[in-house]
């Protein structure tokens, strides 16, 4: 397995992360990227994204509040990413409730590129064609067969797939990881999943093994959440403490404290 200095390599490069994300959590995504050591750019105008992707280190597309303009921008951005060898992270927020989002994902896979799909367990199982329980953008799924869903979807799109829940699951279609860190308080802060998607983009920007980089991003969020909860047990103060702890997180800490089972 590749040397696991994922965070160190990311911070040495300060990667430019181009985000086309939802309006609910755009500020949170920008701030957590800055705290993590990356440089965020929240550029979504469809007549600007093609050129901007070409100078970016990674592209993060979040489908949470998908408008027609964002849809056009997302497809153009994914084409530019393919042409300029820029890794792409997709967060299919709410895809079981709004089927148009699946069409957008398939279009990006057809004409552009997808390197990582990161969603909650309900979203990932839905995309994999498995039975799942969701309510709006939230998963009600207990995680059964989640790694199988990740593996199937990874093979379908030839990418890394991560499914988040009480446990988190990552697969590249052959290898996998199961992560057992985290705190329930992460579910009480809107945008925790969106922020995680941004971290996945940051860690994959300059790291070849994207199964490892995605696992590192999830560990970073979960362990920062655990540490934040030690200091702040209420949602507002927890949110601030989470960003503070992302700023202080390190490779040594995530791999020593991380409860990861490699498959």
Swiss-Prot record:
It comes from the Bacteria. Its cofactor is Mg(2+). Its EC number is 2.7.1.50. InterPro entries: Hyethyz_kinase, Ribokinase-like. ATP binds at residues 118, 164. SUPFAM superfamilies: Ribokinase-like (SSF53613). Keywords: ATP-binding, Kinase, Magnesium, Metal-binding, Nucleotide-binding, Thiamine biosynthesis, Transferase. It is an enzyme of class 2 (transferase). It catalyses: 5-(2-hydroxyethyl)-4-methylthiazole + ATP = 4-methyl-5-(2-phosphooxyethyl)-thiazole + ADP + H(+). Pathway: Cofactor biosynthesis; thiamine diphosphate biosynthesis; 4-methyl-5-(2-phosphoethyl)-thiazole from 5-(2-hydroxyethyl)-4-methylthiazole: step 1/1. One of its GO terms (molecular function) is hydroxyethylthiazole kinase activity. Substrate binds at residues 42, 191. CDD domains: THZ_kinase. One of its GO terms (biological process) is thiamine diphosphate biosynthetic process. The keyword DNA-binding does not apply. Pfam families: HK. Belongs to the Thz kinase family. Catalyzes the phosphorylation of the hydroxyl group of 4-methyl-5-beta-hydroxyethylthiazole (THZ). This is Hydroxyethylthiazole kinase 1. It comes from Clostridium botulinum (strain 657 / Type Ba4).
């Amino acid at each position: 397995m590749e040397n696991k200095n994922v965070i160190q390599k990311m911070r040495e490069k300060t990667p430019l992360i181009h985000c086309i994300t939802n309006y609910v959590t755009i500020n949170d995504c920008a701030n957590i990227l800055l705290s993590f050591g990356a440089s965020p750019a929240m550029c979504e105008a469809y007549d600007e994204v093609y050129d901007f992707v070409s100078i970016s280190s990674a592209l993060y597309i979040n489908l949470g509040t998908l408008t027609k303009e964002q849809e056009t921008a997302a497809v153009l951005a994914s084409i530019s990413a393919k042409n300029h060898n820029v890794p792409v992270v997709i967060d299919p927020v709410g895809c079981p409730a709004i089927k148009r989002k699946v069409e957008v994902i398939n279009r990006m896979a057809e004409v552009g590129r997808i390197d990582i799909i990161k969603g909650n367990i309900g979203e990932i199982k839905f995309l994999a064609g498995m039975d799942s329980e969701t309510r709006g953008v939230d998963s009600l799924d207990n995680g059964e067969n989640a790694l199988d869903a990740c593996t199937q979807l990874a093979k379908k799109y030839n990418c890394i797939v991560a499914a988040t829940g009480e446990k988190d699951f990552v697969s590249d279609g052959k290898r996998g990881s199961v992560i057992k860190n985290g705190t329930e308080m992460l579910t009480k802060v809107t945008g925790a999943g969106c922020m995680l998607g941004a971290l996945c983009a940051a860690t994959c920007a300059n790291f070849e093994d994207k199964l490892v980089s995605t696992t590192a991003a999830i560990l970073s969020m979960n362990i920062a959440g655990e540490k934040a909860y030690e200091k702040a047990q209420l949602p507002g103060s927890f949110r601030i403490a989470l960003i503070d702890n992302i700023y202080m997180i390190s490779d040594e800490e995530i791999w020593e404290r991380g409860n990861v089972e490699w498959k």
